[in-house]
Amino acid sequence: MFGGNSNWRGPVWFPLNYLMVTVLERYHRFYGDEFTIEYPTGSGQQLHLGEVAANLADRMISIFTSDQNGRRACFGGTELMQTDPAWHDNLIFSEYFHGDNGAAIGAFHQTGWTGVIADLIRRRHGDVESLGDVIRRISMAPEPTAPEPTAAGQAETVP
C-alpha cells in the first residue's frame, strides 16, 4: 500500500465517482430535501444529497468541457491538444484523471468505464431517464405474447 504503484490512491476514477453520484441521487429520493450535509466539508454550507450529487456530476463533466480560456482539463499541459483545431475537440477518455487538475492519465486504450460520462451528461443536461431507470423499466415490461393460432392453423404474431 505504501510504495510501488499508487494508481489506486488519489486519481479520479470514473466508475467509483459515477457510483457515488448514483447512490447520492438514490438516497436523496428516499430522504428528500430535509436531509442535508455540509458540502464542501468545512464550508458551513448545507446541501441536500441531490445537490451534492449534481455538484459531483458537474465536476466530472467539467473535466471534458472548455473553460473560459478554451482549455480542457483532460488535456492537461499538452499544448497540441489544447490549441490545435485538429485535436482540441477530440476528447480523451482515459483510464483515470489527475485528482488536482483533471488531466487525463493512465491508459488511453481502457476507455470503456470513462464512457459513463455520457450517462451523466444525459442525466444532467438532457432531462431523460438514467440508464438504470431505463433498464429497470424494461425489465418490468410484460413478456411478449405468444403467437395465436389462426383459423387456418398457422400462428399469427400479436403486435
Regions found by a protein language model. Give the residues of each.
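Acidic, mature catalytic/reactive cores of soluble proteins
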Residues: M1-P159
